[in-house]
Amino acid sequence: EDLRNVTPPKVSLFEPSKAEIANKQKATLVCLARGFFPDHVELSWWVNGKEVHSGVSTDPQAYKESNYSYCLSSRLRVSATFWHNPRNHFRCQVQFHGLSEEDKWPEGSPKPVTQNISAEAWGRADCGITSASYQQGVLSATILYEILLGKATLYAVLVSTLVVMAMVKRKNS
């Protein structure tokens, strides 16, 4: 193999189609690694920081695009409900086995060494809620809960004070 043509992949992650989600209640994420040479790559899926194997379908081998370029695709299928949770984080990771430290490489250009290249996406809420707006909603709900709890505590103290005052007044009369 010609070491001068060693090139790491460009990795893209495509989100599931709305039609698939609506019709099948499933969500398929597609990972595409392309433009790499040689074809020494390993592709893995990670969900919420943990590697997953269930629901994964990866091409059996990299396809040759041209003399010095390969591509590889993989799919991860999850339930529509799981995809619609904005807290779920999906990552496609491609480990590219490039040059070793001993391999000769021309000065002035970056040496394509073994490296991990990733693309990622967050789950999308069904009603257009993003992760940031979801977190803002949780924060607002927490603040509202604390205000209501404070009001209830204040009301309990006020009622208790009135009851004690009534008992003292009754005892004195």
UniProtKB/Swiss-Prot annotation:
A GO term from the CC aspect: alpha-beta T cell receptor complex
Mind listing the UniProt keywords for this protein, alphabetically? Disulfide bond, Glycoprotein, Immunoglobulin domain, Membrane, Receptor, Transmembrane, Transmembrane helix
Location(s) in or outside the cell: Membrane
Main subcellular location:
membrane
Q: Which residues are glycosylated?
A: 67, 116
Query: For side Cytoplasmic, which residue ranges?
Result: 168-173
Q: Does the keyword ATP-binding apply?
A: no
**Any other noteworthy remark?**
Clone B10.A was isolated from a cytotoxic T lymphocyte. Clone 86T1 was isolated from a cytotoxic T lymphocyte.
Q: What is this protein called?
A: T-cell receptor beta-1 chain C region
Native source organism of the sequence: Mus musculus
